[in-house]
UniProtKB/Swiss-Prot annotation:
UniProt cross-references to Pfam families, sorted A to Z: STE3
This protein's record includes keyword Nuclease: no
InterPro entries to which the protein is assigned, alphabetical: GPCR_Pheromne_B_alpha_rcpt, GPCR_STE3
Transmembrane region(s): 8-28, 37-57, 70-90, 113-133, 163-183, 209-229, 272-292
Protein name, entry field: Pheromone B alpha 1 receptor
GO molecular function: mating-type alpha-factor pheromone receptor activity
One Gene Ontology cellular component annotation held by this UniProt entry: plasma membrane
Gene label: BAR1
Length: 639
């Protein structure tokens, strides 16, 4: 009859042998004699059960009588060797918890090992020898189990065989309770004591305690169960003499599985006996197989095996990316450490010192602006009398020693500060990244005549296509059709004594705010601004009491904006007809204002057209929407 647990039990028995013997080398180095004896007895018990379960898996023949003589004695020794090892472990832990001096010299260590060897080795050997007193014949062979001791059921048997595992468990329990009490009583001294011993830590101490207590809780119930079971399954025979007990000692009983499995209590007793060693091995590995020292030794053993087989010892690890702001390649790591140190003592934290230190370190992490590779046009300067018909201002040119930035066909990567009406904002001009790179355009801004509503309009011409745009309106271009579209809100014109106030348009969201201050302009926006010549012409026309022109512009526009002086808070211009000196100052001031607008609003496209006094007013018919690029391009303002 085949074993119903075959091959499950042989596999578990062999795994228990490997798991129990694997940590033995480094425990020998640490002089843990009790733990080493526990591993030895557990490994022997697992190996013995593995061989028996494989050799007699489906029969009860006497195949190896010599092995059976050895096997039954291993089984006898393991039945008390494992509990005795647990006793040595917990006894050693008790002396440590009592904060007594653990052996330091070699002689003291050898004395401690000798005591443990007497308990874990000599006592099991004596126990094995005493089993001859109660041994009725050589051995039994149980099908599916293998070799099994044959002892008589007499009162002497309970004293010689069955009581010792229970007694060892009781002694271990006593030491365990005392160790826990001492540990709780001397916690401070215990922690200081552990620091002086490199081979023992608090984690290992607690794991050893748990192992011993677990083994004790498994051994004592099992020993009691065996005593009760033997007393009930068979009648207890009186002890007569040793000769009566050994009558027919050379007999070997071969018991088929169908016979011994017919009684449920005997099945339970036999299964518990053979599963005891594998379970002890797995319990030990659970407590010590995943510790840090175990992992280190596993790695060392793996390297030795790979070296012997000629295999690579370690698999190359994948390249790891450096952490940002690491201490090896970052200048700001010291700042992070100082910040952490200050955070610990927050009561002495000085905000002023922190902010100054942060300011000094912030420049280390700023990125440099990209270099613009677009070739710039040749520098052209302004004439001293203002803008003439032949003068033009281009981005990339020099105006009174100031160089204007060149437009780029790609996005602007760095923020650009804009100062408007006393406020400073940051605009990141990245709205052109989805646009292609068209060729540069020359956009002309021409002066348009006054209309009957006293509004000023300007003409913007591009490759022959001209259109008129009212002054003071913010425009933006459509990214798809490349057409200029006016916004629906303007800066309100503040009325003067001789001019009526213009009705303000409703305040709707756009890139140009309807309040007195501008919001951040995008790079595709521009606003048509008046010039000093317009102010001079308007003032001179008002003083003469006449209207310069009655022709209506090609497009109706929103109310007129004030002059640059009123718009940017500069003192009002003194424009009087015939006053050449005052007019020259006006032109100089207006040129400065134009430079300020170009500097502060760059790279936004700002078309500010100026004209000289006396220039003829022209009106160009509207031929449709001009094709104006959405990003800043080269501009030319002329009359």
């Amino acid at each position: 009859m085949l074993d119903p647990l075959y091959p499950l039990f042989p596999i578990f028995a062999f795994l228990g042998f490997v798991l129990a013997i694997l940590p033995l080398p480094w425990h020998l180095q640490a002089w843990n004699s009790g733990t080493c004896f526990f591993m030895m007895w557990t490994a022997l018990g697992c190996l013995n059960q593995f061989i028996n379960s494989v050799a007699w898996a489906d029969d009860a023949m006497n195949k190896a009588p010599v092995w059976c003589e050895i096997s039954i004695r291993i089984l006898m020794g393991a039945s008390v060797g494992i509990p005795a090892s647990s006793l040595c472990i917990i006894r050693r832990l008790y002396y440590i918890a009592k904060v007594r001096a653990v052996s330091k010299t070699r002689a003291e260590k050898m004395r401690a090992i000798l005591v443990d060897a007497l308990i874990c080795v000599l006592f099991p050997l004596v126990y094995i020898a005493l089993q001859y007193i109660v041994q009725g014949h050589r051995f039994n062979i149980l099908e599916n189990i293998g070799c099994y001791p044959a002892v008589t059921n007499t009162p002497v048997t309970y004293v010689v065989s069955y009581v010792w595992p229970v007694l060892l468990g009781l002694i271990s329990a006593t030491y365990g309770v005392m160790a826990l009490l001492q540990f709780n009583k001397h916690r401070l001294q215990f922690s200081q004591f552990l620091h002086t011993h490199s081979t023992l830590s608090a984690s290992r101490y607690l794991r050893l305690m748990a192992l011993a207590l677990t083994e004790m809780m498994c051994t004592m119930p099992l020993g009691i169960f065996v005593i009760v079971l033997n007393s009930k399954t068979e009648n207890i025979q009186p002890w007569v003499s040793l000769a009566v007990t050994h009558y027919g000692f050379g007999r070997i009983d071969q018991v088929p599985a169908i016979v011994w499995r017919s009684q449920h209590l005997i099945v339970v007793c036999n299964e518990l006996t053979r599963w005891c060693a594998p379970v002890s091995a797995f319990i030990f590995f659970f407590y010590f197989g995943f510790a840090e020292e175990a992992r280190r030794n596993y790695a060392a053993a793996w390297r030795r095996v790979c070296r012997a087989l000629g295999l690579p010892e370690r698999v190359p690890s994948l390249p790891t990316t450096k952490k940002p702001f690491s201490s090896s390649d970052n200048k700001g790591s010291g700042f992070a450490e100082k910040f952490a140190a200050k955070a610990k003592g927050f009561s002495n934290f000085n905000v002023k010192d922190f902010t100054s230190e942060f300011t000094s370190k912030a420049h280390d992490f700023t990125s440099k602006a990209k270099q613009y590779t677009l070739p710039r046009p040749m520098p052209q300067t302004l004439s001293s009398s203002g803008f003439s018909s032949s003068d033009s201002t281009r981005f990339g040119s020099s105006v009174d020693g100031k160089e204007l930035p060149s437009p780029t066909t790609k996005e602007f990567s760095s923020p650009i500060p804009i100062h408007l009406s006393g406020m400073q904002t940051l605009a990141s001009f990245d709205s052109n990244k989805d646009l292609p790179s068209p060729p540069a355009y020359d956009i002309e801004a021409q002066y348009g005549p006054y209309n009957i509503d006293n509004r000023v309009s300007y003409h913007i011409a591009d490759t022959g296509v001209r259109a008129s745009y009212p002054m003071g309106v913010a425009y933006s271009s459509d990214s798809e059709h490349r057409r200029i579209v006016p916004h629906h809100s303007t800066v309100p014109h503040h009325s003067t004594a001789d001019e009526p106030a213009s009705p303000a348009l409703p305040d709707t969201p756009s890139s140009c705010s309807s309040s007195a201050t501008f919001s951040t302009l995008q790079s595709r926006d521009f606003i048509v601004l008046p010039s000093s010549a317009d102010v001079t012409r308007r003032d001179s026309g008002s003083s003469a009491g006449g209207v310069a022109s009655t022709s209506r512009p090609t497009r109706a526009g929103p109310p007129r904006l004030p002059s640059l002086s009123q718009l940017f808070g500069i003192s009002s211009m003194r424009g009087q007809e015939g006053d050449v000196e005052a007019q020259g100052e006006e032109m100089a001031a207006d040129v400065d204002v134009s430079e300020m607008v170009l500097d502060t609003l760059a790279p936004a496209s700002i078309i500010a057209a100026t004209t000289t006094a006396g220039a003829p007013a022209t009106t160009t018919p509207d031929r449709g929407e001009p094709d104006v690029p959405t990003s800043p391009r080269t501009h030319r303002a002329s009359v």
